[in-house]
Design a protein with these regions (language model features):
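Domain-level signature for soluble enzymes in the chorismate/prephenate branch of the shikimate pathway
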Residues: 1-194
Length: 194
């Protein structure tokens, strides 16, 4: 039940000791890690993007059957010679040599992006933090490429971007998470509800 459009709290009629709080998906990860939330639903991408010390304080109880999305590396459509990460690595060295700068990668996921690019041997880049509308960055001159979360790929396509053939950084989904501070007790309780 809820008491209004602006109310962030709810309850379950036959479970008065359960309190529901509506939070931003990133906030859920933070609150689970510090123990102020016992259980939360958020994205696997947000857990994996968080610092390792936070990840170590959270248990994945279940992967849920909604919220599917992929974190991908996308380049402008007119980069016809860039189809793979290896091609991107070559371009990054060209940019470094010819412009004396680094390939700029706009992203809301700096940790996952950095880990992915380094694991693929791409080293000549600079991350550009994005707070939203990341797809616009290459066309306003703020970056050459992006990494972003996508479900259908339509927004990328509508903005003249395409995913590299081997540009899948992470397959994400909504997950039911538990704070490790109370994981055994909460896990048993959740099992009794389901």
């Amino acid at each position: 039940s809820s008491d209004g459009d602006r109310n962030y709290f709810a309850s379950i009629d036959n479970k008065p000791n359960i309190k529901i709080i509506y939070l931003h998906a990133k906030e859920i990860i933070q609150r689970l890690s510090d123990g102020t939330l016992d259980v939360g639903i958020s994205g696997l991408d947000l857990l994996n993007e968080s610092e390792k010390n936070l990840q170590n304080k959270i248990v994945i109880k279940n992967r849920l059957n909604f919220g599917y999305a992929n974190l991908v590396v996308a380049v402008p459509d007119d980069w016809i010679d860039v189809q793979t990460i290896a091609d991107l690595e070559e371009v990054s060295f060209d940019i470094r040599t010819k412009r004396n700068t680094r390939l700029r990668v706009a992203t809301k996921y700096p940790n996952l992006t950095n880990n992915f690019l380094i694991s693929k041997g791409v080293t000549q880049y600079k991350l550009i933090p994005s707070l939203g509308a990341t797809e616009t960055y290459p066309f306003i001159g703020s970056s050459e490429i992006i990494t972003d979360i996508t479900s259908s790929g339509k927004t990328l396509q509508d903005n003249n971007l395409r995913v590299l053939k081997d540009g899948l950084v992470l397959k994400s989904t909504a997950c039911l998470f538990i704070s490790k501070k109370k994981s055994l007790k909460i896990s048993s309780f959740l099992d009794s509800l389901i």
